[in-house]
Amino acid sequence: MSLSLLTEPPRPPAFRVPWDELQTFEWVRALEPCPQDPIHHAEGNVWIHTRMVLETLVAMPAWRALSSDDQAAVWLACLLHDVAKPFTTKEEPDGRITAKGHSRAGEMLARRLLWELDAPFSLREMVSGLIRHHQIPFYLIERDDAQKLAAEISLVCRADLLALVAEADIRGRVCQDMQRIVDNIELFRAFCAEEGCYDKPRAFPSDHTRVVYFRSEGRSPDVPIHDDTRSEMIMMCGLPGAGKDTAIRERFADLPVVSLDELRHELEVEPDENQGAVVQAGKERVREHLRRGERFVYNATNLNRQRRGPLLSLAADYGARVRIVYVEAPRSTLLAGNRARAARVPEAVIRRMSERWEVPSLLEAHALDIVLR
């Protein structure tokens, strides 16, 4: 399938949406038989809604005024914003139709689909962030944690582009509360502008202030927090075969390494077997380095927030700074690299891992290095 069909949005003067061409994608065809709740989507199924959203978007003066790169990001986010609904939609006991979790699931599905099509990293990650947060402008202004949520959004996408996605989403449907939601989106725009994070990341007094702010409650993002860290954990992150070992040799050859691959070998555990014992052994070795206040590398896939979370919490408990080094390669390069590994991971396992893949962000660590192979 052609990536250009997705990344080159409709152009003037006609701004024609290529509906027939888009239907060549299996995930587009899957939208049509997916029902929606008539209260929020009286227009019908997900494909009808998606078509209405895209037609609304390309007619919006604010979208037409964007740079070509920003147009492509918003266009693609609108096309993919409900891509996970076919997998998350169900009928509740009371007869209502829900799609709980479709935003987060859509982020991960879009990331995998675009990676397989060799989409540029920056475009793909902007689109993924917009999809994950596409409903937040509907209600952010009503949340007690609006300040923190706005700051979080600004570190993974852009609030100004997100507002356009949300506006196209709500105007591209038939519902009773459209005007209330449109008003909330305008309030979202104003709030993010007041917070200084409408078209740029939220600024913090220091990296440590940022990390502690997102890990705790009741703090101001503007009040500096004393940096009392005494060591550093360097957390590698990336799919098998992406080149994490190479990155360690190039950047951290003089540091001790806790490697889950080596622990699998020691414990004689295959990659497609239960990894509980390997993960626990790795955690204990990490704890030993933290107790000694050392700088060290933790080398594992660490592919989503759930996997990274316990180690990041452990590092925080021991007063360690965290640098995440995320390594990525094109799909063809990655699979070739995996085949060349001594400890080859079955490709079916890599596929399953890519379905739960969340690229790290500065919400999680003091520093983030992106290494693209």
Per-region residue spans from a language model:
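Acidic/His-rich, divalent-metal-binding segments that scaffold phosphate/diphosphate chemistry
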Residues: 1-92
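Divalent metal-dependent catalytic cores for phosphoryl transfer on phosphate-bearing substrates
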Residues: 58-184
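N-terminal pre-Walker A segment at the start of P-loop NTPase domains
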Residues: 193-228
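Pre-Walker A (Motif I) flank of P-loop NTPase domains
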Residues: 224, 228-234, 292-294
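Glycine-rich phosphate-binding P-loop
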Residues: 232-252
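Conserved GTP-binding G-domain of TRAFAC-class P-loop NTPases and closely related GTPase folds
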Residues: 234, 254, 331-373
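Conserved substrate/cofactor phosphate-moiety recognition/catalytic segment
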Residues: 245-296, 331-335
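Conserved phosphate-donor/acceptor-positioning beta-strand/loop module used by diverse small-molecule
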Residues: 318-337
